[in-house]
Amino acid sequence: MRRLLAVIAAVAFTACANDDLVIVFDTTTTSPATSAPSTTSAVTTSPSITTTTIAGYGDQVRSVMVDGEALPAFVDSHSDPAIGRPIPTLTGEGYDGTPITIGPDRTNPMLLVVLAHWCPHCNNEIPEINAIRDADRWPDGLEVVGISSAIAPDRPNFPPARWLVEKDWTYPVLADGIDETRGVYIAGDALGVTGYPFMVLVDATGAVRGRWSGESPADALVALVTDLINPPADV
């Protein structure tokens, strides 16, 4: 544990806040998604869901359903009450309309990466993640899944679907939705997101191993994920 805390402390986390976004609630409903199911093992296909569009957002926000208890809002990696808890099941779709379900019923560890298109730290972090991908440095069996959240039409790099392509993000990505009643981004809220980029590391049993917010270099990110998935013995 001492080494894990040292690794976390060594990572320079700098994040974008999400507490100043304005969400518009003029909604219309479109037909259920009919795209082919995903073939990526990090996610499972879900039944067709009704897609909700919001004025000004186009098709960049999608309907997301949550099953299970939401994780508490993130405050501190060192004393995070979410550690050991199962993630809730998130059912939605990608920007290509592919139905996606992310949940605790799994066989491999998973890193969830919540991104905001307008966040400079997200723009800095994606190349670091891509470098890890290209060098095949992730721990064996780790699956990486993105969540596009905090969508804001009046901010840079909108629409996020195009931004992700431009950034060479090749992992599956769930498009977040908006809860009209509470004024929150559904998937982000269910995971306790308080800044961007936000990461949730889940083990092969579906339990949270770690959460953190902010950008970090590739070497530090690999070390953190590896040590949390395969904890070293204390010395």
Segments predicted by a language model, with ranges:
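Thiol/disulfide oxidoreductase modules built on the thioredoxin-like
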Residues: K167-W169, D176-N230
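Hydrophobic beta-strand anchors of alpha/beta hydrolase catalytic cores
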Residues: L111-L112, V144, M199
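N-terminal targeting signals for export/organelle localization
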Residues: M1-T89, D234-V235
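Hydrophobic beta-strand positions
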Residues: T91-G92, L201
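Short active-site neighborhood of thiol/selenol oxidoreductases, capturing the structured segment around
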Residues: I100-N123, I129
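Short loop/turn microsegments at loop-to-beta-strand junctions
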Residues: I87-P88, P109-M110, Y196-P197
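Structural microenvironment flanking redox-active thiols in thiol-disulfide oxidoreductases
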Residues: N123-D168, I178-A187
